[in-house]
Swiss-Prot record:
InterPro entries: Cyt_P450, Cyt_P450_E_grp-I, Cyt_P450_sf. One of its GO terms (biological process) is response to brassinosteroid. The keyword Membrane applies. Pathway: Plant hormone biosynthesis; brassinosteroid biosynthesis. The keyword Metal-binding applies. Keywords: Heme, Iron, Membrane, Metal-binding, Monooxygenase, Oxidoreductase, Transmembrane, Transmembrane helix. Gene3D superfamilies: Cytochrome P450. It is found in: Membrane. It is an enzyme of class 1 (oxidoreductase). This is Steroid (22S)-hydroxylase. The gene is CYP90B1. Heme binds at residue 444. It is a single-pass membrane protein. It comes from the Eukaryota.
């Protein structure tokens, strides 16, 4: 009996590879037939797909699309594909059949039809890092609810009364700690990141800059960010794995803040404070704990990362355009003189609204630097546009950078020219071709705060410092925009009596 069982086992082991091969062949054949049937059905429904190429199996053309390139260009991949196929072409990116759009009209059409023909669809790895309740990945009613909370917290009234003074206070805290010895050399990108992180940590959770807990959170956040832009390989030691660990640590800090407030409320029989977003979300919404945690983490990411890079880009572009710096300084000197005549030492909302050329500089920085390069969307209904058929189920990437750098829309698009926005002579801001914060129902909720941060920081920067690059550096896309060397600058303090420093403001 034992010999018979051994013989059967031996025969099974002998045939096992053939059985597995047969099963694998059956599986791959079935999958291939399903794909062929689906593509045949798509071609029947959508016979006029955009031109393009699929690239390698599984990976498609993803590596080429994400190849590092200067932030002030669309990169070699996009340039070659646009030249070969036009501004609308098909590809295979991030594991999906994809239509890539460098067409201004189609990009507007996509953003205007959010929830009708298209919906937000980021790679799963992004949701794994930011959380399933992150505003970046939510769609439909959950997204609208989260966005409404953010918009209410960032209302115009709050911008004027609370956030403007907070932005100025944090600006002065950063600039006062710049080395007093002149000239001094340091990373402008690091300083911009420190400024925006401390500002967001204060307004999200009332965490003060310089505190040990705040600094620990900032270091955890740096590790977290490295995972956001890494390959989603969840193995010990990988950037993604470390980011998930940092995410858990950051959420633990937020959760402890929530518990402390609930205990304080129960102990003192008082309501939850609303001085920050955490208190606002706990009192003004019916969100669960998990939803609040993901909301705060995603806003820390969105409010810190993009704003800090935009500010670093402004410092970089201005360094190469002395004429713009001079006009900027003249505008802010006039604002400072009016402050002194009023007997005031802090910026008012009226001062901010008078920063007209500053807004031109901000617009041009966002156009040329393109902090947000493209958006992830999915087609939810068959779309017919400019003679092309785009099937439902496909991904579509509206490339905002390609529109901002389009020579048919902007004269000499690779040149930093803030005067193109002055008086809006070209009408570009109202044309729908300028979309640095997205558009439609998913327009960035913090766009006004981001512009306020840049304007206030530039006000105090140009009044008190001159700067130049300490060594050559340039913004690259990796796929997020970053300065390889951290944008090292050499800074000189301004000491003229007429341009008296305002860093002595009592804060």
């Amino acid at each position: 009996m034992a010999a018979m069982m051994a013989s059967i086992t031996s025969e099974l082991l002998f045939f096992l590879p053939y059985i597995l091969l047969a099963l694998l062949t059956f599986y791959t054949t079935t999958v291939a037939k399903c794909h062929r049937w689906r593509r045949t059905e798509e071609k029947r429904r959508c016979p006029n797909l955009p031109p393009g190429a699929i690239g390698w199996p599984f990976i498609g053309e993803t590596f080429g699309y994400l190849r590092a390139h200067p932030a002030t260009s669309v990169g070699r991949f996009m340039e070659e594909h646009i030249a070969r196929y036009g501004k609308i072409y098909r590809s295979s990116l991030f594991g999906d059949r994809t239509v890539v759009s460098a067409d201004a009209g189609l990009n507007r059409y996509i953003l205007q039809n959010e929830g009708k023909l298209f919906e937000c669809s980021y790679p799963r790895s992004i949701g794994g890092i930011l959380g399933k309740w992150s505003m970046l990945v939510l769609v439909g009613d959950p997204h609208r609810e989260m966005r409404a909370i953010s918009l209410n917290f960032l209302s115009s009234l709050r911008l004027r009364a609370v956030l403007l003074p907070e932005v100025e206070r944090h600006t002065l805290l950063v600039l006062r700690h710049w080395p007093s010895a002149s000239p001094a050399v340091f990373s402008a990108q690091h300083e911009a990141k420190k400024f925006t992180f401390n500002l967001m940590a204060k307004n999200i959770m009332s965490m003060d800059p310089g505190e040990e807990e705040t600094e620990r959170l900032r270091l955890e956040y740096i590790t977290f960010m490295k995972g956001v832009v890494s390959a989603p390989l969840n193995f010990p030691g990988t950037a993604y794995w470390k980011a998930l660990k940092s995410r858990a640590t950051i959420l633990g800090v937020i959760e402890r803040k929530m518990e402390d407030r609930l205990q304080k409320m129960n102990k003192e029989d008082s309501s939850i404070e609303e001085d920050d977003l955490l208190g606002w979300a706990m009192k003004q919404s019916n969100l669960s704990k998990e939803q609040i945690l993901d909301l705060l983490l995603s806003l820390l990411f969105a409010g810190h990362e993009t704003s800090s890079m935009a500010l670093a880009l402004a410092i970089f572009f201005l360094e190469g355009c002395p004429k713009a710096v001079q006009e900027l300084r003249e505008e802010h000197l006039e604002i400072a003189r009016r402050q002194r005549l009023r007997g005031e030492c802090k910026l008012s909302w009226e001062d901010y609204k008078d920063m007209v050329f500053t807004q031109c500089v901000i617009n041009e920085t966002l156009r040329l630097g393109n902090v947000v390069r493209f958006l992830h969307r999915k087609v939810i209904r068959d779309v017919h546009y400019k003679g092309y058929d785009i099937p439902s189920g496909w991904k579509i990437l509206p490339v905002l950078a390609a529109v901002h750098l389009d020579s048919s829309l902007y004269e000499d698009p690779s040149r930093f020219n803030p005067w193109r926005w002055k008086g809006n002579a070209s009408g570009v801001a109202q044309s729908g071709n300028f979309m640095p914060y997205g558009g439609g129902t998913r327009l960035c909720a913090g766009s006004e705060l981001a512009k306020l941060e840049m304007a206030i920081f530039l006000h105090h920067l140009v009044l008190n410092f001159r700067w130049e690059l300490a060594e050559p550096d340039q913004a690259f896309v990796y796929p997020f925009v970053d300065f390889p060397k951290g944008l090292p600058i050499r800074v000189h303090r301004i000491a003229q009596e007429e341009e008296k420093s305002v860093l002595t403001v009592d804060i």
